């Protein structure tokens, strides 16, 4: 049972990152690297201008975007690329509702939308803040980061207490 849940999570994670990759390519933002796992690289290959890497620890995944090119895109395209993984997970969860795979997709979408540092929700919030302010502001960005972490923690604690 544990193996099947881990497999569901891994596939949901793969779909999430593929969402970012496909959205970036559709918006002409280079994504030179797609990685599964962390730690030492076990193997990899190049395909279509992307280096696909597989690492020793099968925890997490990432798509490395060309940030300079991403920032040259419109606000709506930046937000689309940053939220594409979450959108894919929500669609997959809806299509497979009531299954472990649906649950893993929903869990992945819910945790990624939180404004926690380096999560998709945080990155999207930063893009929108910078567009709203028309500049970078360290004070505002740190305030958003700290407040986002506090709100996320409060939501998690509230949910945990609610389910006791």
Predicted regions and their residues:
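Hydrophobic transmembrane alpha-helices and their immediate loop junctions
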Residues: 1-164
């Amino acid at each position: 049972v544990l193996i099947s849940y881990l497999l569901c999570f891994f596939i949901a994670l793969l779909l999430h990152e593929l969402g970012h990759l496909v959205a970036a390519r559709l918006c002409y933002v280079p994504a030179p690297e797609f990685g599964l796992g962390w730690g030492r690289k076990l193997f990899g290959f190049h395909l279509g201008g992307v280096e696909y890497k597989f690492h020793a620890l099968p925890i997490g995944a990432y798509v490395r975007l060309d940030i300079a090119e991403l920032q040259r895109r419109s606000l709506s395209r930046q937000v689309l690329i940053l939220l594409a993984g979450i959108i894919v997970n929500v669609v997959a969860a809806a299509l497979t509702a009531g299954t472990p795979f649906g649950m893993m997709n929903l869990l992945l979408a819910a945790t990624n939308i939180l404004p926690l540092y380096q999560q998709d929700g945080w990155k999207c919030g930063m893009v929108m803040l910078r567009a709203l302010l028309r500049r970078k502001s360290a004070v505002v960005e740190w305030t958003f980061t700290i407040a986002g972490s506090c709100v996320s923690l409060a939501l998690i604690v509230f949910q945990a207490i609610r389910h006791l």
